[in-house]
Amino acid sequence: MTEIAAIHAREILDSRGNPTVEADVLLADGTLGRAAVPSGASTGEHEAVELRDGDKSHYLGKGVLKAVDNIESVIAPELEGMDAANQRLLDATMIALDGTPNKGRLGANAILAVSMAAARASANSLKIPLYRYLGGANASILPTPMMNILNGGAHADNNVDFQEFMVMPVGAERFSEALRWGAEIFHTLKGVLKKKGYNTAVGDEGGFAPSLSSNTEAIEVILEAIELAGYKAGEDVAIALDPAASEFYDKEKGKYIFKKSDKSEKTSEEMAQYWESWTRQYPIISIEDGFAEDDWQGWRYFTELVGSRIQLVGDDLFVTNTERLQRGIEEGIANSILIKVNQIGTVSETFEAIELGRRYGYTSIISHRSGETEDTFIADLAVATGAGQIKTGSASRTDRIAKYNQLLRIEEQLGQTGEFLGLEAVNFGE
């Protein structure tokens, strides 16, 4: 019986040493479901609210005791006795309890922890894997990894304006092979950077953050590493970018300012042309947040320019939110949506965003946050939804590797029924 008997929550630490929320959902049959929520460094303005205490004497104001208390004193009394397997009703009940458009009263971190834990408890009670519980009998697609191996922007102290440079092993035949290729390139890149005298410490997501001289040098060292590892750039392995352009957009000037590199300023049209020239010069197949979250005009121009030949992903633009995605669909903006469960705050709404995108030909990429935990929910979510792509960091740091290892286990469980789409998972706007 999947009836909820008790809900408990606690304050734990994420991969950056900041507090986050973990929830336990205990069912009447004694089954436990546990989930921990992640948090982001570069967050979109339109994301659901992550409730922090603001008490400087407790974790420098970043505590989440209010969110924990909201679970135990507000959410638990309402949900206890309900069926954990009725995900939509549980999530709708918590949304109604909160009563704000952005989950600002109870906190998306409180609501999401319970939403995920309930799903896991139900799967455990039914003795089926989480991906099977969430995705049904046909869930069999393993995602192509987008591995963030080099960092700039808000994730690094260097002269690189763009936040993430990723490799996608699109030519691999199965997930485990793609992961191996990515790991080999990551280790080869370390050697390339060392040889050039650069620091090889890793950032929040396990990628290197050396003091490179420019944005182009970042791409060039990756291309060198791909080749040295024995792979062909553009054929075996492609490049994906997440510039996180909101971080270097000046709203007052209405311009993109390369503050960290050459201090140049670009209008939206010039920025679109800049990206277009990069896609001609380098084997780039996906650009996420190439424009600021509210620069709809820039996004439109960009989509018209290159949307028919590369994947254009909205993260800060859409924030896993169906209303913003609907606007993007109507205006012909982007062709892919990044899915971060904590941007919207419930499992049900996450599925709704993926389904809406799919209806209009938008791909989905399941994503981690820079502040992660050992929770592997998103690995199962990627398979459950058949998203075909996952973004969960580099080939280092246990908080990232945990997701990859879970996908290796799922690949093993699926056996011959498992599918790996490689390049086919990526939307070229066709």
Curated annotation (Swiss-Prot):
Listed cofactors: Mg(2+)
UniProt entry tagged with the keyword Lyase: yes
Swiss-Prot/TrEMBL keywords: Cytoplasm, Glycolysis, Lyase, Magnesium, Metal-binding, Secreted
Gene Ontology cellular component annotations, sorted alphabetically: cell surface; extracellular region; phosphopyruvate hydratase complex
Cystine connections: none
Enzyme class: lyase
Ligand binding ((2R)-2-phosphoglycerate): 163, 340, 369-370, 391
Pathway(s) annotated for this protein in UniProt: Carbohydrate degradation; glycolysis; pyruvate from D-glyceraldehyde 3-phosphate: step 4/5
Catalytic reaction annotation: (2R)-2-phosphoglycerate = phosphoenolpyruvate + H2O
Keyword Lyase carried by entry: yes
E.C. number: 4.2.1.11
GO molecular function: magnesium ion binding; phosphopyruvate hydratase activity
One Pfam entry name: Enolase_N
Cofactor binding mode and count: Binds a second Mg(2+) ion via substrate during catalysis.
Annotated binding of Mg(2+), by residue: 242, 288, 315
InterPro entries: Enolase, Enolase-like_C_sf, Enolase-like_N, Enolase_C, Enolase_CS, Enolase_N
Protein name: Enolase
Organism taxonomic ancestry: Bacteria, Pseudomonadati, Acidobacteriota, Terriglobia, Terriglobales
Recorded name of the encoding gene: eno
